[in-house]
């Protein structure tokens, strides 16, 4: 019989495995493993087999291995993992699509009863309806102030009742009632907390972004760049025309207010000194615009004066002539 490995030997083996995975994989899901049983974890490993590896361990061991491996390889990006190793967490190394792996992990959540002393991860609401319990069980409902009535020899809950609030500890009465009603209000499984991809770390919500979401955010970014560039006079293809027009207006305003001038400004100054000149120019432009409409109107009138062509009947070629 082979001798049992010592603690130090186990640490060496674990360190070697973690370092090997860090070298092989560039994508890692950091997952929370609270209330996940060994059988459930085994099922998850089997479901991910092929392109993903699940590694659990103590945070201190994982942090130590990551830090030493970053120093050995010179890859400081690995250090971004260390702040994520808090609480009961594990690592899923994968070469697959991160969204698909995350969805596969979520499939293995299982229902769990409300055990005494457990902190509720969600609000627990008992729905109205027939409980199937006989009237002798009404004491459970009375203790919890749940309104009931007896209907056809069984206890019926009249209205929905919020039995446990998220973050509260499950009491003995709540646990007993939920067990009698056959309600397993909680579900547990590996929950993705963070995503590590080639040194970058982001929240798992990013995996749910669609192409439409990205296009919308890109459009918002372009518009923000446009307004920023026009206000700071930074030229780019979308902002350049507006930057130059605004600059021209500013120069023109300076020329009008000072002795400095240039040909375009001289014309504006003349109009400001004698507004009647501007009126004359506007009046001259109006007939020019009307002149284009005059030939069209004449052509229309000429067309109306043309005699209508004679019909076949008027020329003696009726349809039923013999």
UniProtKB/Swiss-Prot annotation:
Statement: the UniProt record of this protein carries the keyword Ribosomal protein: yes
Alphabetically ordered keywords of this record: Phosphoprotein, Ribonucleoprotein, Ribosomal protein
Tagged with keyword Cell inner membrane: no
GO-annotated molecular function: large ribosomal subunit rRNA binding; structural constituent of ribosome
Biased composition (Acidic residues): 304-322
Transmembrane segments: none
Gene3D superfamilies, A to Z: 3.30.70.1730, 3.90.105.20
Post-translational modification: Phosphorylated.
GO BP term (any one): cytoplasmic translation
Span list, region Disordered: 294-322
GO cellular component: cytosolic large ribosomal subunit
Top-level taxon of origin: Eukaryota
Role of this protein: Ribosomal protein P0 is the functional equivalent of E.coli protein L10.
Subunit structure: P0 forms a pentameric complex by interaction with dimers of P1 and P2.
Family: Belongs to the universal ribosomal protein uL10 family.
Protein name: Large ribosomal subunit protein uL10
UniProt organism field: Lupinus luteus
